UniProtKB/Swiss-Prot annotation:
Entry keyword set: Coiled coil, Cytoplasm, Cytoskeleton, Membrane, Microtubule, Phosphoprotein, Transmembrane, Transmembrane helix
GN (gene name): RMDN2
Record text on subunit structure and interactions: Interacts with microtubules.
Modification type Phosphoserine: residues: S51, S121
Region named Disordered: 122-151
Record's GO cellular component terms: membrane; mitochondrion; mitotic spindle pole; spindle microtubule
Protein name (record): Regulator of microtubule dynamics protein 2
Residue positions where Phosphothreonine is found in the record: T139, T154, T157
Parts of the chain that traverse the membrane: 10-27
Single annotated GO MF: microtubule binding
Topological category with respect to the lipid bilayer: Single-pass membrane protein
Amino acid composition bias (Basic residues), ranges on this chain: 122-131
Family according to the record: Belongs to the RMDN family.
Amino acid sequence: MPHSTNKELIFGIMVGTAGISLLLLWYHKVRKPEKTMKLPKFLSLDNTFNSITLQDEVHNDQGTTVIFQERQLQILEKLNELLTNMEELKEEIRFLKETVPKLEEYIQDELGGKITVHKVSPQHRARKRRLPTIQSSATSNSSEEAESEGGYITANTDTEEQSFPVPKAFNTHVEELNLDVLLQKVDHLRMSESGKSESFELLCDHKEKFRDKIEFMWRFARAYGDMYELSTNTQEKKHYANIGRTLSERAINRAPMNGHCHLWYAVLCGYVSEFEGLQNKINYGHLFKEHLDIAIKLLPEEPFLYYLKGRYCYTVSKLSWIEKKMAATLFGKIPSSTVQEALHNFLKAEELCPGYSNPNYMYLAKCYADLEENQNALKFCNLALLLPTVTKEDKEAQKEMQKIMTSLKR
């Protein structure tokens, strides 16, 4: 038999086999639908969440439901991990781009016999107390797992003794202050962006003396939150967030009726959640809301709390179907909020403190734009232009408001 005929015969057999396979597949899907399992409509754009349950979508089979929920959670965890890794990779690439030219310059200086002085960023300047005897100890990141208040496990929980200390080149004298003077000074320093690092250092200098004083404790936790905001390094941010959360949790345990302790615990839970997987993100979100509500009851005249509550409501109102379903799987109910509820909280912050902040005006403009009240949205954009731009958050808010104004004028 010619070679070409063999090839035609083989090809014919392959086509025939494929046809039979397709026929069998059609038979199982069309002729026997009762034996197939319905899959949930992940891509549905219908936002009706009132009576949908995972059990309805998997034939009310309890065992299958549990397995499906576990697989769903695993898939979401993997996707979240992938996104986190991509962000970390971007950060490392950016760091390398900045470092390589400096490394070349350093090598040239060393070869030329020059002595190089290393510059330290403000967030690295966490001072060590001067001790009578020099103690040397190896510092390492804690790998112990600590169970938090929410009843779940968080790895790599730091303590306040673990920091990024750098020897001071000058001004090694530490002025000893009494508690009232210290608190007034750190509160005043914190009013400016540049003073936050100095405020943090001042608290570090006095932590051994006042570490059990509740007014010192929550301010120290707040200062770690400030350092989180100032830092641009991912590992540093994670470090500051974990220490601050631990300190604020201790403060709550010592003074459960102090609203500031609950406020900063909520804020630092939000910071820590940035480095967690999806399940812990949702857990920390639950803690954030819980302690924010407690803080509002204890400090009803604090505008910052209503700003935070507004941000929470606005974020929840924008959650996707799958994110709401995940929260329902973990906590038994779907988190719900509306743009109107967010708007109410932002307006409350403005009522308590007119001209409260650029970010508050930005979110007011966003809410009104979402509600198609364009005149009110433009009103708050214009009011924001009258406020000074001091912090990094102020600058970001101004940029966002420029975008809002551009979109509203189209």
